[in-house]
Amino acid sequence: MIKKVLQLLIFHLTLAEIVLSGNVVVWPTDGSHWLNIKILLEELVQRNHSVTVLAPSETLFINSRLDAFINFEEIPVSYTKSKIDEIIEHMIALWLDHRPTPLTMWTFYKELGNLLATFYTTNKQMCDGVLNNPTVMERLQKGGFDVLLADPVTMCGELVALKLGIPFVYTLRFSPAFTVERHCGKIPAPISYVPAALSELTDQMSFGERVKNIISYSLQDYIFKTYWGEWNSYYSKVLGRPTTLCETMGKAEIWLMRTYWDFEFPRPYLPNFEFVGGLHCKPAKPLPKEMEEFVQTSGEHGIVVFSLGSMVKNLTDEKANLIASALAQIPQKVLWRYKGKIPDTLGSNTRLFDWIPQNDLLGHPKTRAFITHGGTNGIYEAIYHGIPMVGVPMFADQPDNIAHMKAKGAAVEVNMNTMTSSDLLNALRTVINEPSYKENAMRLSRIHHDQPVKPLDRAVFWIEFVMRHKGAKHLRVAAHDLSWFQYHSLDVIGFLLACVASAILLVAKCCLFIFQKVGKTGKKKKRD
């Protein structure tokens, strides 16, 4: 009996070793994307997996010295950190100056194309630094990796996986108009009720909005096929056979989508798409002593948390003074993450910080509102803790994210370009004083928390699943094996139309033949 128990114990320990000792290689994207995926990597390490990150020699947030729990393979690149900052500043300026409207849409997408061309150049350097570097590739080949975790915003992660002969998993929020998910992942997206990502539309669209939605999808498809299509020749060269970017991306085993139904509008998905939105969220921890003392001085009015994220460093003096003037007029105390010059209009109720523990502040019982730029990470922390928002979106997905929160009744938006002190003040008073905003924020929070598995656990499970089973091919839809005309059943429709046309033609011929026969018979009788 004891022998059997020991054998069973050894068997389970062996299984545990198989599950818990994976070797993961990571192809990341810098910026806020890294801040999100790092939480997932920390959890993988906690579960006894080895994690190696392929990081370029110049980055914004990926720091091998600070993240000692992770192994880093440095990729030599010739661009500098200032080049990355320049691209980000260009992106912010593009959205602020030409935020997509019917009048600015063409200019916006033209400039976006130029920006993508610049991004292509820097991204390609990272690709070459690995794929065309025999020394790095040899080390990776000897690494014994089980799976590659990639953010598809930065190209070539899938190429590294294929060259190493291992499966790969994606982690992403979305691509513009879901181009990658639709064309490469094959998810259906009925344009009648699925708003294109970045369109700032909801699933309740008027006729005019549906027209805008179709235009948004069409423009993003054009950009994807034109600018991102430049990768096709590169991918074909690396793999040594004709292929496309999309065909290669379509080989992803699992797509970990950093969203959930507390954030998204209902729409169809596929079985290899898993929702892990808010995986970085966690219960609030105690605040630093000095910060807690300031929070407690707010009394019954509570506090407002204000952050424009990690990518926006400074504002113009005029804009900073405008904001500070509005904040000075509310009874709440304000904790503002800001590194710029101290505004002349800064009120006694407002304190500036180079950095704030945002999640811990949003989880504080005295927090009444969150002024946010609309980044996904910050919005999910607000959802997690049930805090209503004032959105001041600036670029990329931020306007679209705030549009989602407005539609769900948990946010008010203020336009960064045109806002006045009164606009910001009125928006703050609205979300703080009107109970519906807090109620809707709490409703989203309850939806987020009421899941059978926590988002972080779900993400780890599917990465481990791919390692255990060497992939997840059983979840891959047959759409990947169809041509575009087969996918839309155009061949079948054409065949059926041909059959109908043939039948109509045959009936017409028969009728004509009968009429001719009847006519000849009638003429013959008359002659007789």
UniProtKB/Swiss-Prot annotation:
Coiled-coil intervals, chain numbering: none
Cell location: Membrane
GO biological process, one term: bile acid metabolic process
Family the UniProt entry places it in: Belongs to the UDP-glycosyltransferase family.
UniProt name for this protein: UDP-glucuronosyltransferase 2A2
Pfam families: UDPGT (PF00201)
Carbohydrate attachment residues: 48, 314
Residue ranges crossing the lipid bilayer per the database entry: 495-515
Enzyme class: transferase
Catalytic activity: glucuronate acceptor + UDP-alpha-D-glucuronate = acceptor beta-D-glucuronoside + UDP + H(+); 17alpha-estradiol + UDP-alpha-D-glucuronate = 17alpha-estradiol 3-O-(beta-D-glucuronate) + UDP + H(+); 17beta-estradiol + UDP-alpha-D-glucuronate = 17beta-estradiol 3-O-(beta-D-glucuronate) + UDP + H(+); chenodeoxycholate + UDP-alpha-D-glucuronate = chenodeoxycholoyl-24-O-(beta-D-glucuronate) + UDP
EC numbers: 2.4.1.17
Gene that this sequence comes from: Ugt2a2
Keyword list, A-Z: Glycoprotein, Glycosyltransferase, Lipid metabolism, Membrane, Signal, Transferase, Transmembrane, Transmembrane helix
Organism: Mus musculus
Keyword hit for Transmembrane: yes
InterPro entries, sorted: UDP-glycosyltransferase, UDP_glucos_trans, UDP_glycos_trans_CS
Top-level taxon of the source organism: Eukaryota
The UniProt record lists the keyword Transferase: yes
Entry's Gene Ontology molecular function annotations: glucuronosyltransferase activity
GO cellular component: membrane
Signal peptide limits: 1-21
Extra remark beyond the main annotation: UGT2A2 isoform is part of the UGT2A complex locus which displays alternative use of promoters and exons. The locus is defined by 2 alternative promoters resulting in 2 functionally active polypeptides UGT2A1 and UGT2A2. Alternative splicing of exons results in additional isoforms for each protein class.
